[in-house]
Amino acid sequence: MQTLLSRESVALEILRKPELFPSLPKRREFDRLICLWRIPSFEPHSSWSLYRGRETNENFVRRLEHDPRRGFPSNVVDPHIFGSEVPIPTEMATKIIEQFEGLTVPMFRSPAWAGVDGVSFGAHIGNFWQSTTVNWWSSFSPEWKPLNELFQETVAQLDSLLPTSTLRKIEL
């Protein structure tokens, strides 16, 4: 197991494995249907996850947020993550999963460029036994446009169910 030495590395680990977040109802990796994350260079980092309830078969969406500009960088004990979770209609959760599962993109292409400032995106479906994880940069190849569009549409849908974020810039 890797030792995480900075607050941001701990926060990113929790954003990508949101069942590690202790301040919301306990969830298991095997109940997670999908996890999406957006890591901008100069804005709060966010992840959205869909979970199926173990006893009720009810679905939930969980959003976690972390602002790397806040707090003391070496404080790995408290990485300053904010979370919210609400029920999501089963039909909506099913449609989201089906859309991601039906997506086709060329997977094993070397990127044509690299970036420093921008946004890193990711999606993870599955668990320890079988899974797919995809990461891409804000300057993605044209073949990945459907993935990026589906990501943006899904995040907008999920955010419409969740309370307003207290970390993102709010227009007055």
Whereabouts are the PLM-identified features?
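Function-determining sites in protein domains
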Residues: 1-172
